[in-house]
Amino acid sequence: MTDPIADYLTRLRNAIKAKHRVVEVPASNLKKEITKILFDKGYILNFKFVEDGPQGTIKIALKYDLVNKVNAIKKLERVSTPGLRKYTGYKEMPRVLNGLGIAVLSTSKGVMTDKEARDLKIGGEVLCYVY
């Protein structure tokens, strides 16, 4: 697999379109950090790391509106790819949907949202947009 983050986002996207309640994805440290951000920002209901085998998996409970059956995540968009890395400074940091969405960045201080990176005045690699 050449791009594990794109695979992670695609598995989430497919589970949302199929209206699944839980999705399992292969685990890595970067995927765990992205999942924690999605949980903290309220895009997913819950997650659990399951150690089975050398890699382990992450079980993610997706969040749906009970009345309208609409998911909390409208779009997951991969920005930086292995073939074309996208880096940004804190001054040029993208605002996703004018601040309604989040950009997930990999910085020297770890994986964080665009707002956290802007507050710390550090740039990094833009991994994905979530809204």
From Swiss-Prot:
Q: Which Gene3D superfamilies match?
A: 3.30.1370.30, 3.30.1490.10
Signal peptide start and end residues: none
InterPro entries found in the cross-reference section: Ribosomal_uS8, Ribosomal_uS8_CS, Ribosomal_uS8_sf
Q: Which GO terms describe its molecular function?
A: rRNA binding; structural constituent of ribosome
PROSITE patterns associated with the record: RIBOSOMAL_S8
Assigned keywords, A-Z? Ribonucleoprotein, Ribosomal protein, RNA-binding, rRNA-binding
**Record carries keyword Nuclease:** no
Q: How does it assemble?
A: Part of the 30S ribosomal subunit. Contacts proteins S5 and S12.
Q: What does this protein do?
A: One of the primary rRNA binding proteins, it binds directly to 16S rRNA central domain where it helps coordinate assembly of the platform of the 30S subunit.
Q: Give the NCBIfam families listed for this entry.
A: PRK00136.1
Q: Which family does it belong to?
A: Belongs to the universal ribosomal protein uS8 family.
Q: What is this protein called?
A: Small ribosomal subunit protein uS8
Source species: Parabacteroides distasonis (strain ATCC 8503 / DSM 20701 / CIP 104284 / JCM 5825 / NCTC 11152)
